[in-house]
Amino acid sequence: MLKYTDYDIVFQEIPDEVTLAINLSNCPNRCKGCHSPYLQQNVGELLTEENLSILLQKYGKAVTCVCFMGGDADPYDVAYFADFLQRQQIAPVKVGWYSGKPKLPAEFPIQNFQYIKLGPYLENRGNLKSEHTNQRLYKITQEKMDDITYRFRQLSLIHISEPTRRVVI
């Protein structure tokens, strides 16, 4: 059973999407240098279809994607809720999952997702913006996983110039 601790609307986890990122607890990966070690504990509120529906009613018009951050202790439950998000009628959203595992479990239903990030965080390899990262973000189309990790390096080339506050690419 999945529990979530908090959520936020984010702009960088999934390229070109405004994402409702839901942090799931009870992470079994214990990555050295973890940015959210509190998620290693089995804490938070039970994730339910009702809770997801409430979040969609509140934020559905503002977001284009819902991304589960974690959930490696119960990957098939993550897939269940991804399927729910695909079927619900409150707000059409894409679905993503950030997993810290190096690969998906056997018979995992990738058709429930539009995005999946795989790979543990390794301090010496960096995050998705690092050209040396072991992590990969995949876009799922027609049950094929296309690696779009390069998009994070493109995004990191964008910066705000100080004097005019305009975006420079």
Model-derived features with residue positions:
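Structural recognition of alpha->loop->beta junctions
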Residues: 60, 105-125
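N-terminal [4Fe-4S]-dependent radical SAM core
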Residues: 1-23, 28, 36-41
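Flexible loop residues that form catalytic
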Residues: 39, 71, 120-121
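Short, cysteine/histidine-rich loop/knuckle motifs that typically chelate Zn2+
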Residues: 26, 33, 162
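Single conserved hydrophobic/aromatic residue that forms the stacking wall/gate
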Residues: 158-169
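Canonical radical SAM enzyme core domain
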Residues: 41-54, 73-111
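Conserved glycine-rich "GG(E/T)P / GGGxP" loop and the immediately following alpha-helix
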Residues: 62-85, 131-133
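Functionally critical loop-and-helix segments that line ligand-binding/catalytic clefts
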Residues: 130-157
